[in-house]
Amino acid sequence: MNPVCLPDEKQGKTGVRETKMEDKKMAVTASMVKELREMTGAGMMDCKKALNETNGNMDEAIEFLRKNGQAKAEKKAGRIAAEGIVMAEVKEDKAAAIVEVNSETDFVAKNADFQAYVKAVVNQALTTKAANMDEFMAEAWNEDAAKTVKDVLTEKIAVIGENLNIRRFEKVETEGCVVSYIHGGGRIGVLVEADTDVVNDEIKACLKNVAMQVAAMSPKYVSRDEVDQDFLEHEKEILLAQAKKE
């Protein structure tokens, strides 16, 4: 580049100053912010910041949000997630899964985005081969095999803005019949499995009634034969004490 002589007082000793082309930043438009928000689910201001930081590069902006979301999720991980919902899914009466996913507030538990996420988690549990929570969190996410269940949870924490926790899951597979029952808008969930050669509406209605009874009474055992003797003696003591007071 040729030097250009500029007749001003800032020329320096030689009276010559070199000019350089400045890098031009791409203007971030509302449509770009909207597109990034639809792709990631992040907030509008977060999307705008990501685009500004990456000079409007959409792929780099997504990566920026993911990294930023990871940091946010780690900060939220220590907060108590005491609310949430229980959700169940049954497939062809032969397989079922039930999950409990916690949030910090009841407001988020009722949020459509959160409930859609829990729906995806229970569908994941329906096909899982995991024997425990660690294995479940490490397995590939059904909707995007490039991510793990834990990766998606971390992203969802960043989007929703609360600590979330997949607390527990159960999966049932049977040659008979399995039904589910969810009570109180997701406060209580029950799966009931039965050995049966016949599966029809009457059988399923009967099992549904059993599931409702389980939700109401929270029994610890299925039959008398399973009752632990120490537990039985303890309950007898309580009943005798109550009877004496009456």
Language model segments and positions:
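NTP-dependent nucleotidyl-transfer catalytic core
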Residues: 18
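Residue-identity detector for glycine
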Residues: 12-15
